[in-house]
Amino acid sequence: MADIYRFPKFSYEDNGTVEPLPLRTGPDKKAIPHIRIVKVGDPPKHGVRYLDLLLLGFFETPKQTTNLGSVSDLTEPTSYSICGSGSLPIGVAKYYGTDQELLKACTDLRITVRRTVRAGEMIVYMVDSIGAPLLPWSGRLRQGMIFNANKVALAPQCLPVDKDIRLRVVFVNGTSLGAITIAKIPKTLADLALPNSISVNLLVTLKTGISTEQKGVLPVLDDQGEKKLNFMVHLGLIRRKVGKIYSVEYCKSKIERMRLIFSLGLIGGISFHVQVNGTLSKTFMSQLAWKRAVCFPLMDVNPHMNMVIWAASVEITGVDAVFQPAIPRDFRYYPNVVAKNIGRIRKL
């Protein structure tokens, strides 16, 4: 069993909403490019901004032509057919220009895509034609980038391995950063196990503007019968001295003193941000890597949900602190289906 503390609405109502990407088509029946920028923290209204960018678009392959070797092959542009949709995260950089200049530079990129595999399926991106507005990101764009296929492609199985594939950028998601930085809790700290401790986890409830059932993301019904989505993130551990007895009121008082503020960003698709405005113990602060602002990209927490809702309107409708007994140290984590040294199975 777990005890729950519900955060007040003011802790997430200011920046807890993301507007949808408008899908409009032009005379050529192609989607009209659009850029969406949200603010996290208190970024400057004008001038230099720190922007985190995620490029969204369609994977395309050249269409088969029947008139091979004709003169029209040299004069007519190559036509493409869509084989999937996906994204390309290009990270944070200091940007000086306008949103429309940035959108134009992103849609002009020539992005070659290859599907491959290592320990798991991967997507390889190679980028060319980097315009001036994207020069702050050029250090990353000029190098080949490899991502987990299940995080950046909605249906990686639809990408052919024997054809040329390109990513045609249609939408740009940007997060303008202020005092809040993109600091993730390191995995070693998130997996930390301490004796005599209580795990503080956050249950985040979302309302989206699209139906997600047909895409494999089942909603849950709240008390009013509305369909909602939710996910959990780990914040840290509350530890008391040996011999001290935990109480729900003690844990709630620790959380209330933190004065947490929550917001949504567009890092990796949809991201959940936590800002600490109150007091923290040194033990808890060390678990946050000594940061007062941390980011939880949904791309890492729940990749499939992220891909289904990353272009939709998203709104935080509730955040709960869930107090659970910390997992004992002697419990073993099995990241693989094939367990080590079981029967005749041996890991190489």
Swiss-Prot record:
Changing I182V: In strain: Mutant KD-22M. Changing V161M: In strain: Mutant KD-32M. It is found in: Virion; Host cytoplasm; Host cell membrane. Changing S197C: In strain: Mutant KD-22M. The modification Phosphoserine is found at S70. Changing C83S: Smaller viral particles. Keywords: Host cell membrane, Host cytoplasm, Host membrane, Host-virus interaction, Membrane, Phosphoprotein, Viral budding, Viral budding via the host ESCRT complexes, Viral matrix protein, Viral release from host cell, Virion. Its main location: virion. InterPro entries: Matrix_C, Matrix_N, Matrix_Paramyxo_C, Matrix_Paramyxo_N. Changing T212A: In strain: Mutant KD-22M and Mutant KD-51M. Changing C295 to A/G/S: Larger viral particles. One of its GO terms (biological process) is viral budding via host ESCRT complex. GO terms for cellular component: host cell cytoplasm; host cell plasma membrane; membrane; virion component. A motif (YLDL motif) lies at residues 50-53. It comes from the Viruses. A large portion is phosphorylated in the cytoplasm, but not in virion. However, this phosphorylation is not essential for virus replication. Changing C158S: Complete loss of viral infectivity. One of its GO terms (molecular function) is structural constituent of virion. Late-budding domains (L domains) are short sequence motifs essential for viral particle budding. They recruit proteins of the host ESCRT machinery (Endosomal Sorting Complex Required for Transport) or ESCRT-associated proteins. The matrix protein contains one L domain: a YLDL motif. Plays a crucial role in virion assembly and budding. Forms a shell at the inner face of the plasma membrane and concentrates the HN and F glycoproteins. Acts as a negative regulator for transcription and replication by sticking to the nucleocapsid. This effect might be regulated by the cytoplasmic interaction with tubulin that dissociates the M protein from the nucleocapsid. Homomultimer. Binds to the cytoplasmic regions of F and HN proteins. Interacts with nucleocapsid. Interacts with human alpha-tubulin and beta-tubulin. Interacts with host ANP32B. Belongs to the morbillivirus/respirovirus/rubulavirus M protein family. This is Matrix protein. It comes from Sendai virus (strain Z). The gene is M.
